[in-house]
């Protein structure tokens, strides 16, 4: 859900065998018009310090950018349209969306020379899914049969198993996966780096592999991870997968802020910045011309509401809050008009996105908002707004929202609760917040389901739940293609009627790069820059 994809597959009558998936949009990846250069050379990428480099231990977008070069998970997403295609796998098949058979490439090795087998994937997944390991990507494996035995719900209870019962190694290159329930999006899920394989050395000593990862991707780590300074990758000459690396070396330079990284890019001290600050968009466009891009993003910001608090229990009040917010004015003032005001629960690059799913609920209408607010009985007590200090713009737009709620609804007392990201996350997860909060969602794969499951999971931060909503999501999970999307859209409609999360705006990502490099492909669906495709011109 952090940092990082229509349904993955076309509907099939009996058997789904995947070698490629249906196109699902017209979003083109970012790349320059000049022709690719020759293989060789080195280039640098600006990055914020990752938290981990072991795939199952991280969901951070900063880590995932590095892992994109180090590991090949079973599947990948096409940067042109988000469709799913094999990567470390060569095919997958199912007859019921429950039992899946994965066939992997033969003749591939890890960076230490160990052969990559079906067991390498099973071992990695079991390690990530085992609750006591406390790996960050644990929940990505919750769809697989046996997950609950590895993650008992009772406090202090011990797991009754060490491995997922739904995994069965059939032979050296074949893995059978049994899910707990039908899930047609499963191949798309397999593109997430946590599903990459691990060698025996990594499962035996994950702490060592976390700082010196041993992957199966086109690049290997070169030297030590210099914390808060740099990470160097070198071409893996033994790579036998489908991604042929062009540059010999990739240097990740670590910066503490995007603003500093942008200054370094202007000075020629780094070659690629995939997160140009919104405030610098006009300057970046002027300086870099065709080497600057604004591309679609699946990332959304919401205002979450604690619906179990009696003050927020009435959906009319929640709609009044939404209609009192001037999304266009805020995005113009704070994000230079780069971010798009939300008209849906999901990003506009997502297959099945509807341009006006939210309707009048997301339209700025202070008069109608005040009428709804009064009909709902108004609001008692101070309104506390919760957000993190991770980005200065969060406080800026929360201040704008506070002023608009004061002016348009007459809520006079508003208090800010700004705190460190980890503290805010803990507060929200424990349900101890006393008011609305910033909720962000970064897609893992381009499906409406990813938003629905990510925002409205059992025990979610808003406290909202509905059995009919759950049934609609489950119906979509059991289907594929247009049938799945139709069920997910009905679930989205219900969530927008109840509005435990108020959609605010859809991010748009900005990137720029130096004239030293060509063939820059920045993926709106996955982990940013395609490291293997970049060529160096000098």
What are these regions (language model features)?
Residues 116-126, 172-178, 218, 247-249, ...:
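Alpha-helical secondary-structure segments
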Residues 340-375, 389-396:
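Structural transition elements
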């Amino acid at each position: 859900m952090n940092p990082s994809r229509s349904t993955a597959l076309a509907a099939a009558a009996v058997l789904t065998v995947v070698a490629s998936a249906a196109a699902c949009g017209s979003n083109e990846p970012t790349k320059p018009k000049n022709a690719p250069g020759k293989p060789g050379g080195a280039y640098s990428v600006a990055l914020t310090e990752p938290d981990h480099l072991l795939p199952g231990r991280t969901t951070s977008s900063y880590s995932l950018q590095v892992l994109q070069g180090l590991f090949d998970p079973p599947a990948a997403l096409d940067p042109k349209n988000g469709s799913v295609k094999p990567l470390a796998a060569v095919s997958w098949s199912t007859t019921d969306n429950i039992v899946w058979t994965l066939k992997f490439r033969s003749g591939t090795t890890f960076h230490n020379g160990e052969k990559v087998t079906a067991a390498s994937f099973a071992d990695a997944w079991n390690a990530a899914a085992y609750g006591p390991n406390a790996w960050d990507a644990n929940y990505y494996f919750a769809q697989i049969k046996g997950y609950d035995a590895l993650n008992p719900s009772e406090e202090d209870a011990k797991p009754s198993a060490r491995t997922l019962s739904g995994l069965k190694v059939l032979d050296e290159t074949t893995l059978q996966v049994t899910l707990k329930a039908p899930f047609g999006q499963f191949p798309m899920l397999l593109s997430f780096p946590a599903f990459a394989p691990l060698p025996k050395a990594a499962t035996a000593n994950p702490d060592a592999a976390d700082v010196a990862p041993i992957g199966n991707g086109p690049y290997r780590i070169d030297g030590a991870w210099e914390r808060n300074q740099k990470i160097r990758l070198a071409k893996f000459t033994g790579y036998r997968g489908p991604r042929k690396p062009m540059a010999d070396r990739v240097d990740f330079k670590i910066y503490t802020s995007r603003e500093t990284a942008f200054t370094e890019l202007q000075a020629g001290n780094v070659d690629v910045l995939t997160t140009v600050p919104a405030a610098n968009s006009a300057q970046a466009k002027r300086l870099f011309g065709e080497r600057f891009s604004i591309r679609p993003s699946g990332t959304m910001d919401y205002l979450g509401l604690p619906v179990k608090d009696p003050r927020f229990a009435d959906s009319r009040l929640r709609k009044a809050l939404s209609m009192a917010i001037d999304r266009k004015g805020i995005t113009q003032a704070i994000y230079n008009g780069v971010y798009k005001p939300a008209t849906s629960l999901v990003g506009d690059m997502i297959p099945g996105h509807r341009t006006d799913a939210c309707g009048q609920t997301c339209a700025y209408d202070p008069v109608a908002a005040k009428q709804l607010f009064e009909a709902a009985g108004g609001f008692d007590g101070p309104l506390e707004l919760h957000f993190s200090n991770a980005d200065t713009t969060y406080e800026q737009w929360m201040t704008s929202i506070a002023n608009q709620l004061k002016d348009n609804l007459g809520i006079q007392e508003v208090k800010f609760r700004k705190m460190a990201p980890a503290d805010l996350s803990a507060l929200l997860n424990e349900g101890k917040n006393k008011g609305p909060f910033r909720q962000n969602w970064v897609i893992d794969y381009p499906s409406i389901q990813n938003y629905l499951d990510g925002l409205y999971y059992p025990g979610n931060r808003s406290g909202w739940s509905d059995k009919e909503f759950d049934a609609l999501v489950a119906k979509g999970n059991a289907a594929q293609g247009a049938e799945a999307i139709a069920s997910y859209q009905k679930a989205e409609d219900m969530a927008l009627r109840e509005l435990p999360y108020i959609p605010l705006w859809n991010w748009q990502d900005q990137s720029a790069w130096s004239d030293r490099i060509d063939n820059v492909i920045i993926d709106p669906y996955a982990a940013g820059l395609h490291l293997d495709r970049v060529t160096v011109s000098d």
